[in-house]
Curated annotation (Swiss-Prot):
Recorded effect of pH on activity: Optimum pH is 6.5.
Protein's job: Involved in the naphthalene catabolic pathway. Catalyzes the meta-cleavage of 1,2-dihydroxynaphthalene (1,2-DHN) to yield 2-hydroxychromene-2-carboxylic acid. Can also cleave 3-methylcatechol and 4-methylcatechol.
Protein name (database record): 1,2-dihydroxynaphthalene dioxygenase
Alphabetically ordered keywords of this record: Aromatic hydrocarbons catabolism, Dioxygenase, Iron, Metal-binding, Oxidoreductase, Plasmid, Repeat
Originating species: Pseudomonas putida (Arthrobacter siderocapsulatus)
Length: 302
């Protein structure tokens, strides 16, 4: 039975990095991700579960988001969503088998969101059931993935209304969830959108940003793993942009730490299930105080 022509998860992402060795160490020792190096000189992979990979790390002259890969259920949904994008005036390119195989999927199309973020839509990812996830450091549990995808991202947008329209077309639901008073008397608004049970998979606001990617959130099943990750950041004197705290929207206990590429990683635990009813907040439940400024999140959240 054909399902709705809509995105169902953030399946994979690509990042460009200047220092691949630093990223290998960071991914394994700080976060507990598995590094998979198959001998390709320009890239390696990060695993979180049975998928061949969830993150592709490209060796580059830049440190930023390379692309986001959004999954649809199958070929009928892939074709229908592609037609929806064309009918709405968006430019897409359906890739050949060579490009699809490079991403290790059965079907692939490429486009851009209104903020210029490279956006890929795919179906049929490679799942390696004979190769279980082997964390880069001991974990008490695992990462929350499955039908919730790999995590969530906040990306740069210059036109929030256009971004909301684009992601709504892809099947996302959501709107403004934070209205944060600023010292200058203005109010920062952040929009959060979901496509599955994860509270949100994409978020954005009309804020200036040096990079496409502000942060990536990865969720642990066990609080012990979040605590150890936080301890490792402190022990290794890695910048913590926002201290431990609990968000009002997704109820997750998280902190925000710097990656070797200068954008933020948000390790978390116990995220809430998405709701369809719209509501907004003016701050967090507790914590998330600014510790290391300059990472694009210098706002008072509690």
């Amino acid at each position: 039975m054909s399902k709705q022509a809509a995105v169902i998860e953030l399946g994979y992402m690509g990042i460009s990095v200047k220092d691949p060795d630093a990223w290998k160490s960071f991914a394994m020792n700080m976060l507990g991700l598995q590094v998979l190096d198959e001998g390709e000189k320009d890239r390696f992979y990060l695993r979180m579960d049975y998928w061949h990979h969830r993150i592709v790390v490209h060796h580059s002259a830049e440190d930023d988001l390379e692309y986001l890969g959004w999954r649809v259920a199958g070929k009928p949904e892939f074709e229908a969503l592609g037609q929806k994008l064309i009918d709405a005036g968006y430019k897409i390119r359906v890739c050949d088998k060579v490009e699809a195989q490079e991403r290790m999927v059965l079907g692939l199309m490429k486009t851009e969101d209104p903020g210029g973020n490279p956006t890929e839509i795919f179906w049929g990812p490679r799942i390696d059931m004979s190769n279980p996830f082997h964390p880069g450091r001991p974990l008490h549990g695992k990462f929350v993935t499955g039908d919730q995808g790999l995590g969530h991202c906040i990306v740069r947008q210059t036109d929030v209304a256009a971004a909301h329209k684009f992601y709504s077309l892809l099947g996302f639901r959501g709107d403004v969830e934070y209205r944060i008073p600023l010292p200058n008397g203005m109010t920062a608004e952040l929009s959060f959108m979901h496509c599955n049970a994860r509270d949100h998979s994409i978020a954005f606001g009309a804020m200036p940003a040096a990079k496409r990617l502000n942060h990536l959130m990865l969720e642990y099943t066990h609080m012990e793993d979040l605590g150890y990750t936080h301890q490792q950041f402190v022990k290794n004197e890695i910048d913590i942009a926002l201290q431990l705290g609990i968000h009002a929207n997704d109820k997750a206990l998280t902190f925000y730490g710097a990656t070797p590429s200068g954008w933020l990683i948000e390790p978390g635990w116990r995220g809430a299930t998405a709701i369809d009813e719209a509501e907004y907040y003016v701050g967090d439940i507790f914590g998330h105080g600014v510790e290391a400024p300059g990472y694009g999140l210098d706002v008072k959240l509690s």
